[in-house]
Amino acid sequence: LGLEVHPTGNDYKEIRQYSLSDKANGKSYRISVKREQLGAPGKVSNYLHDSVNVGDEVRLYAPAGDFFFVDRQTPTVLISAGVGITPMQGMLETLADNNHNQPVHFLHACEGSEQHSFSQRTSELVKQNNWQQNIWYRNEEAEQAHISNGMMDLASVDLPTEKGNFYLCGPIGFMQFAKQQLLKLGVGESNIHYEVFGPHASL
């Protein structure tokens, strides 16, 4: 979804693209914006958090892109890292709403519990639909059985490598890392789908 705003004190308008984080309902769009504070603070993300309120109007541009969920009634594996969880949340909501009758695996990696967006909601969806969930925290130990410490290890998970469709989203280095693991496990390249934040490129 394209969003255009004119941050206070800025000479020019700014346009940002955001992934949708909820299922389509024909009435509204939901985006989930992380406040960027470290390094060069996010101009638009901070403006949205600090200055935009319910009832304010912003200019939107229709969603577009080549990364979307195709309900093929095959096993589905969603693999994300960091803010790459955003479109995966929308896909999980869609799968639940459509009563997807094939196995679903949700795999996510992040720094720790404080950076784990949507954790409560995804756990609810996984439990309600009898799906599988595996999480990796790089800098935190956790007591839950489905959460591991360290780097994501796809070989440690029982995945539908022959028939599944795999969706990747996150930093490009992470997606390259995940894709190489999938290829080594025997997943066909045509069954690996991904989104790069920026101009589309091959992994």
Placement of each model-derived feature along the sequence:
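Histidine-anchored nucleotide/phosphate-binding helix
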Residues: 85-97
